[in-house]
């Protein structure tokens, strides 16, 4: 049995660049192609290692900046042979270009009632398809801010997968599943409705605290160990998170060498482990055993200490403005 690897990249306009009053071309550049390590670079690395990745694209900025930037994202991804699925940050619903971010809708999808969430998902789906994407079958809420109303709406709309549950950010991820749930599952309320939850993979950081399997959150060694653990323990799937802008500093004008090295190491590791840990698109609909009791990688103080030292360098040196 193999372990399915979902390498997911949330692809969006960074709100901070909109709030800074930048024009749409500069927002695109700093969010999608920052410092030469954005979409183009990431797609090239994926191709070099013959890996599959899912790009969760948020089309909602089209409400104020038009559909062309979203079409550009979608075509770049699809032309590279990768997959586009739906991401949604509802703050863009009441945003105004050039107002410094003062106007905005609610930032968390889960702050809306079920009917409003459904309407937002329908609206976002229509925008994504208008931008040239196939009709999405997988979804991730912005900031993982989904709840059971989100799952109800997705099931009703015919989605096959949600990947919003993240036990490491339980303050915003409100799906009623255990924090340590990392195996694919159909929540009881969704039995027979066709929607499978694919949780984001987490590892144990300290007693009672979890950390996301994400480029900016774990060192290369920790990520590799988490993948090895998943294979050795016979996990059904691992779900890795990154962002289109994550390999650059927050200003989007300088590459973060720590994060770039982590991405390159992750791609090399997934390439080397492809027989046991094949990367998948959600559109592949890989067979997934449901309800398995997969456990996060246990904490390791040495790995944690090494990562904290690396993080300190990343935050103090690599995050400097270019």
State what each model feature region is.
Residues 215-322:
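C-terminal domain-boundary segment and adjacent tail
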Residues 25-33, 56-64, 106-115, 137, ...:
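The substrate-binding groove and active-site-proximal loops of carbohydrate-active enzymes
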Residues 140-235:
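Active-site-adjacent pocket scaffolds in enzyme catalytic domains
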Residues 95-98, 174-177, 248-257:
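Histidine/acidic-residue-rich catalytic or RNA/ligand-binding cores of hydrolases
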Residues 56-145, 242, 250:
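Metal-dependent polysaccharide deacetylase catalytic core of the NodB/CE4 family, i.e.
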Residues 7-19, 58, 88-91, 198-203, ...:
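Short loop/turn segments at strand-loop or loop-helix junctions that form parts
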Residues 1-80:
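Active-site beta->alpha N-cap acidic-glycine motif
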Residues 5-9, 53-55, 84-88, 137-139, ...:
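Hydrophobic faces of well-ordered beta-strands that scaffold small-molecule active sites
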């Amino acid at each position: 049995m193999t372990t399915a690897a979902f390498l997911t990249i949330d692809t969006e306009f960074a709100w901070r660049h909109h709030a800074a009053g930048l024009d749409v071309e500069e927002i695109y550049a700093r969010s999608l192609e920052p410092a030469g390590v954005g979409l183009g670079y990431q797609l090239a690395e994926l191709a070099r290692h013959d890996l599959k990745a899912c790009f969760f694209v948020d089309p909602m900025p089209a409400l104020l900046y038009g559909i062309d930037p979203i079409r550009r994202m979608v075509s770049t991804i699809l032309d590279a042979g990768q997959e586009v699925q739906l991401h949604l940050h509802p703050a863009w619903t009441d945003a105004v270009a050039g107002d410094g971010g003062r106007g905005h809708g609610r930032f968390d999808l889960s702050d809306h009632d079920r009917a409003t969430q459904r309407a937002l998902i329908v609206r976002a789906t229509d925008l994504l398809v208008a931008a040239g994407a196939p009709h999405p079958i997988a979804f991730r809420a912005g900031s993982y801010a989904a709840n059971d109303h989100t799952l109800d709406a997705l099931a009703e709309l015919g989605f096959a997968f949600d990947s919003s549950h993240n036990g490491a950010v339980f303050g915003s991820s409100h799906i009623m599943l255990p924090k340590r749930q990392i195996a694919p599952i159909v929540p009881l309320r969704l039995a027979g409705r066709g929607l499978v939850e694919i949780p984001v993979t987490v590892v144990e950081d300290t007693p009672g605290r979890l950390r996301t399997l994400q480029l900016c959150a774990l060192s290369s060694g920790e990520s590799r160990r988490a993948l090895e653990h998943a294979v050795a323990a016979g996990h059904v799937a691992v779900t890795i998170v990154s962002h289109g802008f994550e390999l650059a500093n927050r200003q989007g004008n300088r590459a973060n060498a720590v994060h770039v090295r982590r991405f390159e190491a992750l791609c090399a590791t997934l390439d080397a482990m492809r027989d046991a840990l094949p990367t998948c698109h959600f559109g592949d609909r890989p067979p997934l055993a449901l309800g398995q009791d997969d456990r996060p990688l246990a904490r390791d103080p040495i790995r944690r200490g090494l990562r904290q030292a690396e993080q300190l360098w990343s935050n103090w040196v690599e995050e400097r403005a270019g």
